[in-house]
Amino acid sequence: MMKNRVTNIHFVGIGGVGMSGIAEVLHNLGFKVSGSDQARNAATEHLGSLGIQVYPGHTAEHVNGADVVVTSTAVKKENPEVVAALEQQIPVIPRALMLAELMRFRDGIAIAGTHGKTTTTSLTASILGAAGLDPTFVIGGKLNAAGTNARLGKGEYIVAEADESDASFLHLTPIMSVVTNIDEDHMDTYGHSVEKLHQAFIDFIHRMPFYGKAFLCIDSEHVRAILPKVSKPYATYGLDDTADIYATDIENVGAQMKFTVHVQMKGHEQGSFEVVLNMPGRHNVLNALAAIGVALEVGASVEAIQKGLLGFEGVGRRFQKYGDIKLPNGGTALLVDDYGHHPVEMAATLAAARGAYPEKRLVLAFQPHRYTRTRDLFEDFTKVLNTVDALVLTEVYAAGEEPIAAADSRALARAIRVLGKLEPIYCENVADLPEMLLNVLQDGDIVLNMGAGSINRVPAALLELSKQI
């Protein structure tokens, strides 16, 4: 067992959302955990409060005494800590391999898919918690009810996100898996081949043992395409009545979704029951159906499912409501923050906002993430951004990429302006965005702050500015 051979575990890039969660679980299991990161953030502060040594920056000395070094995808081979570890013959492994090791100690439930992983993982953990199963979880966002993105439970299950962006989900060996959808994103990883993307998801499903079970969303065209090649046991879910688990009578009730769940899954009692999900959006109905499927498979009751969905307190940066902010011209606007950065998930979130607040003006502040994604999905971005009532665009968050002139925010603004419906406002520096938004907003507006980059700092700055009014 790992515990007999490994004592000290060092994380390079420990502040990353996937890394910090695994570090916390290992710390709670009794391992001596340390880590380093270029930037301080809420995750590094939280880990420090637990007694974990977090070093600012990267130097070779940080790996001294480590039995294994864990790296995130963002960490380069030239990193001085990685170089020093290899020179000292200390194993250097990717984050997903350490997650796979955690799964060896418990029954793993791995949630994969291009969109909806974090919410589905969180909903699954919430229902299993309501069922008294006390799961361990590692999530790509902060579960609001727990105040953290990871927790060591006493139960037999571990619920974790499975990351397809670098194909690292192929390291995992869960007993149950979910595929929420498949979309053409991170295509550099798959040589820009849809066939290779499909094969990766098939291989992920086949990582389960013969007694495992996958839950696959048939509302996704790409998921439907791989079904004939899946040879492990699976059940389908979706909004179509041919699915093994499906939803009808879907209704927006304010910022909640009410719907009827129908179960016609082999080996389970057939029937239907009503649920209320404490978050808006039809896409979240699908995420809830996946969590319901997993919950039924592990023996959770209908009552536990209803309790887990109604009591769900949400996830950080997934339609996260900050409440009303005061405006300089009088009145207030509701501030909502979201991680969405792909046109498909953005469209779903904007539809959720329209459904929850149908009479309100919707103002979007958006920071595109990566020049290559903006280039590859330029038309899709233009279409979805043109659906709001007012738009403020800040410059692309490069994530280490070189700028691409025809795929920056100025180009997006020009393309949207040509369509004739909106006059986008361009904000070159994201630091200027809070003040700019206060001048754009009107009483009663919904302002949606969206993106996966440095725009995540805007809500706190906007709230601070608003307090001074």
From Swiss-Prot:
Enzyme Commission no: 6.3.2.8
Q: Which InterPro entries match?
A: Mur-like_cat_sf (IPR036565), Mur_ligase_C (IPR004101), Mur_ligase_C_dom_sf (IPR036615), Mur_ligase_cen (IPR013221), Mur_ligase_N (IPR000713), MurCDEF_pg_biosynth (IPR050061), UDP-N-AcMur_Ala_ligase_MurC (IPR005758)
GO biological process: what's one of them?
A: peptidoglycan biosynthetic process
Q: Name one Pfam family in it.
A: Mur_ligase
The catalytic activity, as recorded, is:
UDP-N-acetyl-alpha-D-muramate + L-alanine + ATP = UDP-N-acetyl-alpha-D-muramoyl-L-alanine + ADP + phosphate + H(+)
Q: Name one GO cellular component term.
A: cytoplasm
State the pathway, as annotated in the record: Cell wall biogenesis; peptidoglycan biosynthesis
Keywords, comma-separated and alphabetical: ATP-binding, Cell cycle, Cell division, Cell shape, Cell wall biogenesis/degradation, Cytoplasm, Ligase, Nucleotide-binding, Peptidoglycan synthesis
Per UniProt, where does ATP bind?
Answer: 113-119
Would you say which domain of life the source belongs to?
A: Bacteria
| Cited function | Cell wall formation.
Entry-linked NCBIfam families = murC (TIGR01082)
* Protein name as catalogued: UDP-N-acetylmuramate--L-alanine ligase
Name the species this protein comes from: Neisseria meningitidis serogroup C / serotype 2a (strain ATCC 700532 / DSM 15464 / FAM18)
